From Swiss-Prot:
UniProt lineage: Bacteria, Pseudomonadati, Pseudomonadota, Alphaproteobacteria, Rickettsiales
PANTHER family, A to Z: ATP SYNTHASE, ATP SYNTHASE SUBUNIT BETA, MITOCHONDRIAL
Stored InterPro entries: AAA+_ATPase, ATP-synt_VA_C, ATP_synth_F1_bsu, ATPase_a/bsu_AS, ATPase_alpha/beta_chains, ATPase_F1/V1/A1_a/bsu_N, ATPase_F1/V1/A1_a/bsu_N_sf, ATPase_F1/V1/A1_a/bsu_nucl-bd
Chief subcellular location: membrane
SMART domains referenced in this protein's UniProt entry, alphabetically: AAA (SM00382)
Protein name: ATP synthase subunit beta
Amino acid sequence: MAKNIGKITQIISAVVDVKFTNNGELPEILNALECYNDKQRIVLEVAQHIGDDTVRCIAMDSTEGLVRGVEVIDTGSPIRIPVGTETLGRIMNVVGEPIDGKGDIKSSNISSIYKPAPDFTNQSTERNILVTGIKVIDLLAPYTKGGKIGLFGGAGVGKTVLIMELINNVAKAHGGYTVFAGVGERTREGNDLYHEMIDSGVINLAEPEKSKVALVYGQMNEPPGARARVALSGLTIAESFRDMNEGQDVLFFVDNIFRFTQAGSEVSALLGRIPSAVGYQPTLATDMGELQERITSTKYGSITSVQAIYVPADDLTDPAPATSFAHLDATTVLSRQIAELGIYPAVDPLDSNSQVLDPMIVGEEHYSVARQVQQVLQTYKSLQDIIAILGMDELSEEDKLTVVRARKIQRFLSQPFHVAEVFTGAEGKFVNLADTIAGFKGLVEGKYDDLPEAAFYMVGTIDEAIEKAQTLK
């Protein structure tokens, strides 16, 4: 079959116009076109047909040095990337090229980054909890298999460490794989994450097939086309893991979903579309829906996504975060105030929530214990002003008891992480859900009122707290 060849007629930043004159056939919308800029392959994605013989494209790489008249070849399909276990332990860019300097990714499976969401008949409607082994999450804001979790956190509160522990625990407990999509990521942060994963054993350089994670990066310095599509590239790899070997549980991280929206806004402006509210693209809801609807469980496996979400100017009504919220099943909020107390993971037990914290799904005991824990913590929070002004002595005996229990609960919500062993020297703990519920049930019922506060800090199960109390005496 003869190749469909065109020539570049106009270049405006990341937008490139290509004219096809040979047989009058235009490439389809979303097709990938290839050209070479001084031996460097550049992929262009068809965005618009602007006449009988010209297409307008978005470049997936820098157009610096590209000139008019350069030959462009229609590949005949959308962007295709390598998928499967060969991607484990590797970093690739939006078009599937390795960027870790470790040679080509030799995968026999190549897949388009555009796929329809699974059919309704193939989707699973069961709601099962994904046990993470992290007490505060499993008890108060449980994740669901195939669910979407929003992770809100500023700089330095432990977001990366929490992400790495989730990667480690889910892979260990479920034998599942993880995909990390760095969307508009700072190159330094992406580099740090990669090296931390190597140090903590999540990536095995000697035997890459034993790694638990595949990484796809579209850094902050890259053109908007790459940043707008890199989440789809990551999701395509996650889907391949979900559907292989009779199904897998896959964890899919996106950092940051706001930058995916922001890149879409830039692309929209470059294509001359009329902006909608606050300057965002008119297709904001559609773009978000196309990504989010593919993140789902089938009868064979699940994709559970954890999405870091930046909230511009702390305005939750901004169209970008507001559109994301509509798709989330749970929110995990990391708090600087809790991090300042030295309690890690610094998850806010009162701000974080989950749709699956429902007696019909988690069971009556789990639901009851979680609500009692939150009630004790909420009472303690409302008493803090009184304590700050008048001191503990002015409280009633009942309130004093509540404060003592709340402080123990606060400390028991902390736990040592496997991936932080290098820094803390403390052995990481994976806590089963039954042990988590039993421990907090005993705390709210007053069974451990005689144990010192320090015994509950940075331990796994309640038995470890009892053992620690013996050593403190």
